[in-house]
């Protein structure tokens, strides 16, 4: 195989990978991120109340995310959860940037460069920033978040109804356990 053929093959691979990555950033069709978003008010700690189970959070309890404005202008992201089977915390740090105007809650989040995924706030307590519903790039990713580890059932029901209307598989939503952590083994 000639050097030119190898270079062309590599270039095609990189272009194909880039197209695939770009396809993972937008919101699902028919799902719009909220507008009038205030990133500074969104910063801080959020607890996962419900989620559609996914490979990177499977088995984790006490899941939370912390967002902060970094000096370089990116949004710092720290996701954390407790692995009760191994009795240890797992966390990962990343960064996010707005996909467009900062008043539209559509961001791309990267934990491993150059890979990024979409993060779209699709419902929000605009008055107090007390709860939010976040979608990923497909309907297979959905979270209900709150500033505290509990959220009233009426708000959860309202958010689940909105998710159902947007054709998310709400039957796949699971509650996130935020009970006290105790790893003592019985003797």
Stretches with model-predicted labels:
Residues 24-187:
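A beta-rich soluble binding module of mature secreted/lumenal proteins
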Residues 2-14:
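Bacterial N-terminal signal peptides that target proteins for export
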Residues 12-22:
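Bacterial N-terminal signal peptides
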């Amino acid at each position: 195989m000639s050097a030119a053929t190898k270079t062309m093959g590599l270039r095609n691979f990189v272009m194909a990978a880039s197209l695939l990555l770009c396809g993972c950033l937008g919101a699902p069709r028919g799902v719009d991120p909220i507008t009038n978003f205030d990133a500074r008010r969104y910063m801080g700690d959020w607890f996962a109340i419900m989620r559609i189970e996914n490979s990177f959070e499977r088995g984790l309890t006490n899941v939370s995310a912390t967002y902060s404005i970094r000096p370089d202008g990116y949004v710092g992201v720290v996701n954390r959860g407790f692995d009760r089977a191994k009795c240890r915390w797992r966390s990962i740090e990343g960064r996010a940037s707005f996909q467009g105007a900062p008043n539209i809650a559509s961001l791309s989040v990267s934990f491993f460069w150059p890979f990024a995924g979409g993060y779209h706030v699709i419902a929000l307590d605009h008055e107090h920033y007390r709860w939010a519903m976040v979608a990923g790039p497909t309907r297979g990713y959905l979270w209900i978040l709150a500033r505290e580890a509990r959220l009233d059932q009426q708000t959860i029901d309202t958010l689940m109804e909105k998710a159902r209307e947007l054709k998310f598989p709400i039957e796949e939503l699971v509650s996130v356990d935020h009970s006290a952590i105790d790893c003592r083994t019985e003797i």
